[in-house]
Each structure stands twice: as structure tokens, then as C-alpha cells.
Amino acid sequence: MIHGLLGRKIGMMQYFTKEGRAIPVTVIAAGPCIVTQIRTPERDGYSAVQLGYEEVEARKLTKPQQGHLKASGGKMLRYLREFSADDPLAHKPGEVVTVELFKPGQKVDISGTSKGRGFAGVVKRHGFRGGPKTHGQSDRHRAPGSIGAGTTPGRVWKGQRMAGRMGGDRVTIQNLEVVEVLPEQNLLLVKGSVPGARNGLLQIRKAVKG
């Protein structure tokens, strides 16, 4: 069995359980994905299954990408990602992998690109408290304060939390519960929120710690 799938975030909604309890869920359009390559220890040094997702016109891909995909079934696919599998050699290029890979109640890890926030200060970016609001304070309400000592070390330490570009990073949220699987619509409902904006690409994997 392959341990993951590619999909797109559709949005969030309320889901009512059989007990009548409302829980927040994220709706994900997961798959179908196509197996495009099998990685083997003899040839590649590791085992994995490469999946392709989302058909696209050939002109939008480079010649090497087109050649790679023609050798594995001919469908032109926008995204290629690799996933581990119980037995990679049990799968063949061209095989279709659907959302039925997952079951309700299962735990999954979901990775995506977080929303970009642009240049942000330390209060928003790192949760700094800021300076005092009164007693003569005039313009340092959201300033970081001191960023280091004096002569020793005479520099700012690497990794010092400062203002800068926020968001747009790869983020993984672990152990999200699968609430419902809808194979006919290729939809996956998971409890809680997932990284990124609507329509963002997601990698859904079997939970490592679940």
C-alpha cells in the first residue's frame, strides 16, 4: 500500500457527527493520482513510489518532463511527488491511486505551503510582547528591544528573532483525523485546519506518529 496522496485544499465547513456535535473540518480534493515511477534500492538507493497529480497540457511541461511521463503511461501531469510504500514493486507505472487509500478514523500528516504574510514585525511574526504603552513611551510599542549585548560578543547571534518575511513556508500538521471519505467525488474530510490557502497543493500521508 502507498502511504500518501496529493490533493488540493477546497475550504473549511462544519460537520455534524451522529451524536449531533458540530466539528470543524477541511475539505480536500484528494487524487486521483497516477503512479509514474518506482524507485528501487538497486537503481536509486532507496525505495519509493512516484505519483503524478493533475492533468495538464503538454506545452506547459519541459521536454524532459514530457519524456519522463510518456515512458510511464503518457498522461501529462503537473505535479510529481514521491511517497513511501509497503512494497513499491507491487505497483506499476500507470496505476491509479484514489482517495479510498484512506479510511474514516485514520490519522494523517498533511503538508502544504502556509499563507504568505509579507514583511512582518516581531509582534506578528514571533509573538513578542512589545514595549510599554505609557510612562513616556512614544514610538517603541511594537519594537523588538535589544538584539544583543555590547562589546562581547560584538555582533548579533545567528538565528536572532527579528522582523522579516513571514509565511510562504512548508508546514506539516501531524495526526489529523480523517472524518469521512467520499470516493465518488474524490473528497477527503479531515478534522481541523490544514496549511495554506484555498486551492493550495497538499501532500496527505499516513501518520508517522499516529
Swiss-Prot record:
Purpose of the protein: One of the primary rRNA binding proteins, it binds directly near the 3'-end of the 23S rRNA, where it nucleates assembly of the 50S subunit.
Gene3D superfamilies reported in the protein's UniProt record: 3.30.160.810, Translation factors (2.40.30.10)
SUPFAM superfamilies in the record: Translation proteins
Organism the protein comes from: Chloroflexus aggregans (strain MD-66 / DSM 9485)
InterPro entries named in the record: Ribosomal_uL3, Ribosomal_uL3_bac/org-type, Ribosomal_uL3_CS, Transl_B-barrel_sf
Coiled-coil stretches: none
Chain spans, region Disordered: 125-154
Stored Pfam families: Ribosomal_L3 (PF00297)
Gene: rplC
GO molecular function ontology, one term from the record: structural constituent of ribosome
Lineage: Bacteria, Bacillati, Chloroflexota, Chloroflexia, Chloroflexales
Alphabetic keyword roster: Ribonucleoprotein, Ribosomal protein, RNA-binding, rRNA-binding
GO cellular component: cytosolic large ribosomal subunit
Assembly notes: Part of the 50S ribosomal subunit. Forms a cluster with proteins L14 and L19.
Protein name (database record): Large ribosomal subunit protein uL3
